Amino acid sequence: MTDIAVLVHGAGSCPATAALLLGPAVPDGVTPVAVTARADVESVVDVVDAAAHGCRVVLVAGISLGAHAAALWAVRGGRADSLLLAMPAWTGAPDPVAALTGRSADEIARRGRAAVLAEISAAAEGDWVVEELRRGWETYDDDALVAALRAAAGSTGPTRTELAAIRTPTAVVALADDPLHPESVARTWSAAIPGAALGIVGRHEPATDRGALGRTGRTLLRGA
């Protein structure tokens, strides 16, 4: 039986970004499996389950919507040695952060992803988040990207009650000063999950160390 780590990207992102940001959390000797997650969170839970089938799952690591899916997978009986939940975006019913994702989808539908990305890039030149956004968006056509973002915006995240049911050793990692993935949400998740460890990565730290989120998670899980 193969030992694997399932890596789950966020809405509008891609497996390459998940591997880059979360890969350092994968223990030595474990095979990373970066899945494609282009649907609503319930469908992404099924993707994680399919990837895990027939393997020993050492780690499930998700970022943004991928973190939501990883948590729900564990709640629903998925078995892993550990969880890394990075940059969760909301808890329970879609909130104003989800609405921002929906508005991004509307803008792309109206103007096209190239125009929207150019505007974002001009407003935040050199920002690593924008660079990773570009990496992800360029793997979609406009219709597919709009569909993925709208699916994410309408997805319910894990509730506090569901998070409290997780029994897998868990690290929750926030990115400081990120309005789309508020630190307060990560704190809520870590407080709700029994025994979870919380880490905060500086907003600009991944600019020079893309693996900072994954590395922080691995350090936290070693202490769990």
Where do the language-model regions lie?
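Conserved HGGG/HGGXW glycine-rich cap/lid loop of the alpha/beta-hydrolase fold
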Residues: M1-V41
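Conserved acidic catalytic loop of the alpha/beta-hydrolase fold
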Residues: V41-V58
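Gly/Ala-rich beta-loop-alpha elbow adjacent to hydrolase catalytic centers
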Residues: A61-A70
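Flexible "cap/lid" loop of the alpha/beta hydrolase fold
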Residues: V75-A109
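Hydrophobic, aromatic-rich cap/lid helix
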Residues: E131-R160
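Short beta-strand/loop motif that positions the catalytic acidic residue
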Residues: A165-I166, V172-A174
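Conserved alpha/beta-hydrolase "acid-adjacent" motif
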Residues: P179-V185
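Catalytic active-site module of serine/aspartate enzymes centered on a nucleophile-bearing elbow/loop
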Residues: P194-A224
